[in-house]
Every structure is written in C-alpha cells, then in structure tokens.
Amino acid sequence: MGLNIRGRSFLTLLDFTPEEINYLIDLAVEFKRLKNNGVEHKWLSDKQIVLLFEKTSTRTRCAFEVGARDLGMGVTFLDSGSSQMGKKESLADTAKVLGRMFDGIEYRGFKQSVVEDLAKYSGVPVWNGLTDQFHPTQMLADIMTAREEFGDMRGRKLTFFGDARNNVANSLMVVCAKLGMHFCACGPKELMPEDWLIEKCQAVAAETGAVLEFTDDVAVGARDCDVLYTDIWLSMGEPAELWEKRIKLLRPYQVNKEVMAMAKPTAIFEHCLPSFHDRETTVGEDIYQKFGLEAMEVTDDVFLGHQARQFQEAENRMHTIKAVMAATLGAEF
C-alpha cells in the first residue's frame, strides 16, 4: 500500500502524517475484508508481543489479543499484579528486558510518560492502548467507522459532547486536525482541552485546512454535525461528591434525541464504550438511586437507535489495532 512505518512506535497521532493515518485505516479496511471472507493472514507467525495493562479493559485487550492471533503471533498478558514494573524493577530495566524477549509491547495505563519511556528503552515498537492523555488506537476505529458511512472525511464535522479535556477528546482533536476535518469541542468552559494541545492542533490545522471550534452551546455543537461523539462522565473509584459535581456540570451535554435532531439527518452517533445509557449496570442503578438519572452521557433511545454506530466502532478496534501491529512490525502485504 505504499508507506513504510516498520519499527515505529504508536504513542500519539501527533507523531503521524495524514498520509500515514489514512494508510493505517486503509490497511484496517483490508484486514476487515480478509477476516469477513475467512481469508487467513498469519503474516507474523514468527513474532511475540506482550500486553501491559495497569488499567482494566474489555475492547482494547480483546482487540489486541484477537488481532495478534489472527496475524499468527504469540501473546503474553501482564497486569499490574503480575509485573514488577515500577515496584521492584525500574521502568527502564523492565523495558530493556521485554525488548529482548518480545517484538512489540502494548501499554494501557495512566501516565503518557510511561508509554514514551517504554518506547525509549525497549528498542521495539510500543503501542499506546490508552493513557490519561491520549487514546490513539481508538481514533483509528472512530475514523474508520465514519469513513464507512461517509467516505472521505475532509471537511466533515465531528463534535465531542462532554468533558472535552479527557484522553478521547484530546485524541479526537488531534486526528481531526490531521485529517482536515471540522472538530468541535462542546462542553463546559472549565473542561475544554488544555492550551498547549490546542496550539499544537491549530498548527496542524493551518497545514491541513481543518477547523477547530470550542463552544459551551449544544446547539452550536450539533449544528451541521456529521458525527456526534461522547464518553462517560466519571471513572470508577471517584468519590460520590465528585460524581454529583460532574453530573451537574455535564448534564446539559447529554446526547439525546433532541440533540441528534439538531444535527444533519445523515449524522451518526459514536461512543468509545463502556456507556451508562440505562440502569442495567451496578453503576447505572446507583446513579439512578442517587441522582434520578435513567441515563448519563447518552440516552437509551439514541444508543439503540438507527444512527448509533458504537458496536461497529468496537469491532473496528480489532481491525485498526491489527493494522498498527502489522505495519509497525513489518508484515509483507
């Protein structure tokens, strides 16, 4: 397919050109076609990878494990309870050891500096499965899903509703800037992206023709929107008093049928999951009992409606992650 990114780490999309990002998505589309047609593609059967998880995961872990096995690779999983990294062994030492045993390393955890240091010291490709700052593999799936709907994404408007300073919103702003899209962050003024990242993305947008917009007005965010996107409002383990504050702050930015109606009739809804769209979880029921909310960031009718694409998006995590691993490990296409 033309581009060569063999040996590179995948830490943030700020490190990749628009052509490289589209190349990875094109490759993911091809992997999806192969898998759907039952065509074997064990092109990396001589490779071994390790997955380092300091945070729990469903989609990211499954996508890496299934994708790696589809490519013929061996997979080792280490969580915080089965690794000495940062406890009895320094991060640098762990990285050097893993780099001698494995061909690639995935990391899902907290600090962006950890995944960057793994790449610095290991000597092998390192893939960011999520940090507090960025979630780049999610972005490839998000754009792939939108491309399956609209084709070329240049000029298309994607609006993130809610906490626009979180890792998903950060990464959406980056990928939209890279691909010449119209990105809108719609949320409370105190939860807008950090200035340093806005400045980086504005510099990218000046080259690609992207538009970056920031508003606390839901109608402005939804107007002419092609992709309406949201994420959960709170994380597990946070104190109840923080829940109350965040729910009060973010409740006006819930994606519901009224918000969807303000967007283009052809608009789609995306969500990185998990979602609190009903009371069918312990957390959902707890929120209902404490605050009387049947749903949080998105209502059940939108989540289950004809414009929703979050499960297609979740499947595409596997295809896009497979593309990242294959391209950086040097599979022959």
Features from the language model and the residues they span:
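Positively charged, low-complexity intrinsically disordered leader regions
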Residues: 1-62, 66, 134
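C-terminal helix-to-coil terminal segments
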Residues: 286-333
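Active-site cofactor/substrate anionic-group-binding motifs, chiefly glycine-
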Residues: 48-101
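Glycine-rich phosphate/diphosphate-binding loop of Rossmann-like nucleotide-binding domains
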Residues: 53-66, 148-231, 236-238
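Anion-binding alpha/beta catalytic cores of soluble intermediary-metabolism enzymes, centered on
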Residues: 95-96, 103-175, 271
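Rossmann-like adenosine-cofactor binding region
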Residues: 202-299
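Short, structured coil segments at secondary-structure junctions
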Residues: 71, 101, 121-122, 179, ...
